[in-house]
């Protein structure tokens, strides 16, 4: 059997009629249209917005905002750039105590970390708890040494 445009039919159940609410009891959706009896949810202009609690102060406004929280296990360092280490002489040891004596570090309460901003022209023995890769490369290329201290 050949099919032509005038004999085409849609599949059964593929073209379902729209349910007409409020058009008589026999339809099954008459009178209250499936919204139940009285109340805000049965009125026109529904639904209420998400999070609405009937005029009561909603939960998302009762709970305080998430702010001023501390990062768990955050590693804080007292930082010194290589540009400040130019005040030291050749073959001098650089550690927290020597930095405090030269007033390059004030009241250090965190472990020492050396950052790579600046140039080192002298040979230094640097003792710190952490180094950036660039800082370590610059110190060693100048003929110095980097000693990583135990981080307690």
UniProtKB/Swiss-Prot annotation:
Bias-annotated ranges (Gly residues): 25-37
Task performed by this protein: Binds to the 23S rRNA.
Family as reported in the entry's similarity comment: Belongs to the universal ribosomal protein uL15 family.
Complex and partners: Part of the 50S ribosomal subunit.
Entry's Gene Ontology BP terms: translation
Chain intervals for the UniProt region annotation (Disordered): 1-56
Signal peptide from the UniProt entry: none
Entry annotated with the keyword rRNA-binding: yes
Protein name: Large ribosomal subunit protein uL15
One GO MF term attached to the UniProt entry: structural constituent of ribosome
GO cellular component: cytosolic large ribosomal subunit
Coiled coil: none
SUPFAM superfamilies given in the database record: Ribosomal proteins L15p and L18e
Cell membrane found in the keyword field: no
TM region(s), chain numbering: none
Domain of life: Bacteria
């Amino acid at each position: 059997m050949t099919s032509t445009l005038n004999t085409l039919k849609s599949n059964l159940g593929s073209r379902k009629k729209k349910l007409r609410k409020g058009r008589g009891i026999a339809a099954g959706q008459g009178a209250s249209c499936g919204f139940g009896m009285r109340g805000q949810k049965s009125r026109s202009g529904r639904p209420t917005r998400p999070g609405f609690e009937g005029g009561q102060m909603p939960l998302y406004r009762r709970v305080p905002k998430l702010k001023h929280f501390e990062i768990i296990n955050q590693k804080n360092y007292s930082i010194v750039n290589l540009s400040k280490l130019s005040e030291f002489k050749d073959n001098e040891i650089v550690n927290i105590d020597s930095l405090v004596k030269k007033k390059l570090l004030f009241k250090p309460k965190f472990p020492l970390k050396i950052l790579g901003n600046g140039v080192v022209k002298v040979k230094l023995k640097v003792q710190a708890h952490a180094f950036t890769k660039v800082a370590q490369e610059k110190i060693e290329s100048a003929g110095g040494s980097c000693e990583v201290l135990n981080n307690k």
